[in-house]
């Protein structure tokens, strides 16, 4: 459930994937850049939703011109729309070239921009000149195009279409067209927020170089698999060889229970000339060992092989410029979605693999090859910040940046120039050029999408605070202070509980869990990098699996107790808030906080871990983190501890008001968890409230729902912490 890392990985290096429109008829809606209201002087839910959100970014090969998409939301119509911009970095001039498009990339040596648009009713590939002229639809596929990737010679294009190849859910009976029931025969019948009635497939189409992309042929014809992988994969999971003769692609070729319990995806090489496929991860004679599906794979034979067979997540391939090598991100162990992501390099000349980031004791996010074929740039989190790095093929890693922010690598322009996006707890994403000189990266901001917000609103300071844990270790916490903070006053404070549970508390900007809007409401926020978070070594990361309520919970309490030593913190007005595993944390703390807190808010959290095992869809996750199914009786230690310390077992000790929030389309953690917690609280006479969203998943994506979320959030906190 490592959602933040998954989203960072989905920030495409060279490809495109369609942004899901907000609203059923969003394809025809034009939303202009909204006019923000700064009268309050501080960030509000309405002003937060008025900010532009920078999406896909691309540069010409010389780095002189960039194109990027910005999504704007209209609160009244409850819809969003993306506008494509071009900026000349030599003249510093920016102009909009298309309203209603997204995922722009340069084609034809930087003279035109290809992108996705639904302007004519279905999602198709369009092209427009960099001056905004001659916009035209260049694909006319029968199905929506969900993503596209041009070959280097631009004679072919990969188009992503959904195909109706899933037999887990039976098709409707012809004489019952209005029947809504689904006959389900196996796992995985649902994923994230959708029932699995179709799968994305790559189609290879011809491009005439001017105005027409052909219909395309299914590269995985007849195969019941996904490419890209659901629910978050885009065309970063495919790559063209430099000679345009081969395609590398990511695929997890499994079905049923095996699909639901295994993370073993591989990198395959497809030859266009003879239509043959080779698995680059495993030898041709590899046979997957049998497994017990209801037990953790940690100690099973699939993870005990002496030969390197890449049995974990392998994805996002990229060829070196000369075509000799291909690199991809690789996890070592099957069933462990939060394993460290390494860079694996395959040498076509020798047929050997090597791992070139072994000395970096954290995960690789986005990456890109240097033009010299001997170095790779990448981003990765360390000590609560995501920086840019470079490694050579011998595994010598150099850190290039050291800024208080999170970078995401977009494109390697040259050995000395990188294109990146950058955000922090004080700033939303903007585009930067990073100049690399003498093993150091110097960042230069090139977009200023939300400058008026930063100039016209007051912002709180963000400071690092190291806290001693109960076992004598050091825990990094971010502390966010209200604007115009006055140390002579006393402020209510919030403990922010991170989700994942293996997602970093880095310098992230969120349009929902936004630290600045909490600070703008005069709360001090402490956000701990508790046990289980990446960026502090593998031991720290792995101390949470099988122990959800041990040291990680003590880390939370150590953080808030340490903050309460400050005279400006009112320890009689403390709250705890969090989503996903953070919601689990809140539910557990509600029965174990020893009267520290006066208010709780849990969003999409797990209330009953036994219930969670049989309700969630990606079963590899509870198998690994909870150590097995709840009915398994062998290996009793960690497994029984995971279920024996479920939050619902402490509800008799609940004594504090709690707000339970959940989306009813959340298949990762079902909304029945919130209903159960809310019912238990009310039956015990505890002041409680529940906010349900029938049309939202694990996140809240619609403008009016987002504002309702924020208003309800602060009304609840203010009721109990600002008396």
Go through each PLM region and give its residues.
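Predominantly five- to eight-bladed beta-propeller fold
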Residues: 24-35, 81-82, 162-222, 250-253, ...
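Short glycine/acidic-enriched loop and turn motifs that connect beta-strands
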Residues: 72-76, 119-122, 164-167, 254-257, ...
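Active-site-proximal cap/loop segments of hydrolase catalytic domains
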Residues: 514, 519, 527-723
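Conserved beta-propeller blade repeats
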Residues: 52-66, 98-116, 135, 142-157, ...
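Cap/lid segment of the alpha/beta-hydrolase catalytic domain
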Residues: 255, 440, 449-572, 579, ...
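Beta-strand-rich domains and repeat architectures in extracellular enzymes and scaffolds
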Residues: 46-82
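Short loop/turn segments that connect beta-strands within beta-propeller blades
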Residues: 88-92, 129-133, 207-210, 271-275, ...
């Amino acid at each position: 459930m490592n959602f933040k890392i998954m989203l960072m990985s989905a920030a495409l290096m060279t490809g495109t994937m369609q942004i899901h429109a907000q609203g059923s008829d969003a394809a025809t809606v034009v939303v202009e850049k909204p006019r923000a209201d700064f009268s309050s002087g501080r960030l509000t839910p309405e002003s937060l939703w008025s900010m532009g959100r920078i999406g896909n970014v691309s540069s010409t090969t010389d780095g002189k011109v960039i194109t990027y998409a910005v999504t704007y939301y209209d609160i009244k119509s409850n819809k969003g729309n993306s506008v494509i911009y071009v900026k000349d970095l030599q003249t510093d001039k920016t102009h909009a070239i298309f309203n209603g498009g997204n995922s722009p990339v340069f084609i034809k040596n930087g003279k035109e921009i290809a992108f996705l648009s639904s302007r004519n009713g279905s999602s198709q590939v369009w092209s427009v000149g960099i001056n905004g002229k001659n916009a035209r639809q260049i694909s006319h596929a029968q199905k929506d195009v969900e993503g596209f990737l041009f070959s280097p010679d631009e004679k072919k294009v990969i188009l992503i279409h959904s195909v109706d190849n899933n037999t887990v859910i039976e098709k409707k009976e012809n004489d019952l067209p209005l029947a809504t029931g689904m006959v389900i025969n196996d796992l995985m019948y649902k994923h994230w927020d959708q029932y699995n009635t179709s799968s994305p497939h790559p189609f290879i189409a011809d491009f005439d170089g001017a105005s027409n992309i052909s219909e395309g042929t299914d590269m995985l014809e007849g195969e019941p698999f996904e490419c890209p992988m659901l629910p978050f994969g885009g065309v970063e999971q495919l790559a063209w060889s430099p000679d345009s003769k081969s395609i590398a692609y990511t695929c997890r070729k499994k079905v049923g229970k095996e699909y639901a319990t295994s993370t073993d995806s591989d990198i395959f090489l497809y030859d266009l000339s003879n239509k043959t496929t080779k698995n680059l991860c495993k030898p041709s004679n590899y046979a997957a060992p049998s497994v017990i599906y209801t037990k953790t794979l940690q100690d099973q034979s699939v993870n005990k092989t002496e030969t390197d067979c890449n049995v974990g997540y392998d994805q996002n391939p990229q060829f070196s410029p000369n075509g000799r090598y291909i690199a991809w991100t690789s996890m070592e162990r099957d069933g462990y979605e939060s394993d460290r992501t390494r860079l694996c390099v395959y040498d076509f000349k020798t047929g050997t693999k090597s791992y070139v980031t072994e000395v970096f004791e954290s995960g690789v996010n986005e990456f890109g090859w240097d033009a010299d074929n001997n170095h790779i740039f990448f981003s990765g989190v360390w000590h609560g910040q995501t920086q840019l790095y470079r490694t050579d093929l011998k595994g010598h890693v150099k850190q290039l940046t050291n800024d208080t922010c999170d970078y995401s690598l977009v494109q390697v322009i040259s050995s000395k120039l990188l294109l990146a996006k950058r955000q922090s707890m004080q700033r939303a994403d903007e585009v930067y050029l990073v100049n690399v000189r003498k093993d150091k990266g110097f960042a230069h901001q090139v977009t200023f999408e939300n400058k008026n917000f930063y100039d016209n609103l007051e912002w709180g300071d963000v400071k690092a605070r190291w806290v001693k844990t109960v076992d004598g270790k050091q825990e990094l916490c971010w502390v966010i202070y209200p604007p115009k903070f006055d140390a002579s006053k006393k402020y209510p404070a919030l403990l922010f509980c991170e989700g994942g549970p293996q997602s970093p508390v880095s310098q992230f900007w969120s349009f929902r869990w936004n630290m600045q809007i909490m600070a703008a409401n005069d709360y001090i926020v402490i956000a701990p990098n508790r046990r289980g978070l990446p960026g502090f070594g593998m031991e720290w990361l792995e101390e949470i699996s099988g122990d959800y309520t041990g040291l990680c919970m003590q880390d939370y309490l150590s953080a808030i107790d340490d903050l309460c030593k400050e005279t400006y913190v009112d320890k009689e007005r403390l709250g705890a808030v969090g989503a996903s595993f953070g919601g689990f944390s809140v539910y557990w703390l509600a029965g174990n906080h020893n009267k520290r807190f006066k208010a709780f808010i849990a969003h999409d959290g797990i209330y009953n871990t036994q219930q969670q095992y049989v309700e969630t869809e990606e079963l590899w996750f509870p198998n690994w983190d909870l150590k097995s199914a709840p009915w398994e009786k062998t290996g009793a230690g960690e497994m029984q501890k995971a279920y024996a310390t479920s939050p619902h077992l402490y509800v008799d000790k609940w004594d504090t008001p709690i707000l339970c929030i959940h989306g009813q389309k959340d298949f990762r953690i079902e909304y029945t968890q919130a209903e159960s917690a809310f019912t238990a609280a009310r039956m015990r006479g505890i002041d409680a409230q529940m906010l349900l969203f029938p049309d939202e998943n694990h996140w809240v994506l619609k403008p009016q729902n987002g504002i309702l979320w924020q208003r309800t959030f602060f009304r609840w906190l203010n009721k109990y912490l600002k008396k």
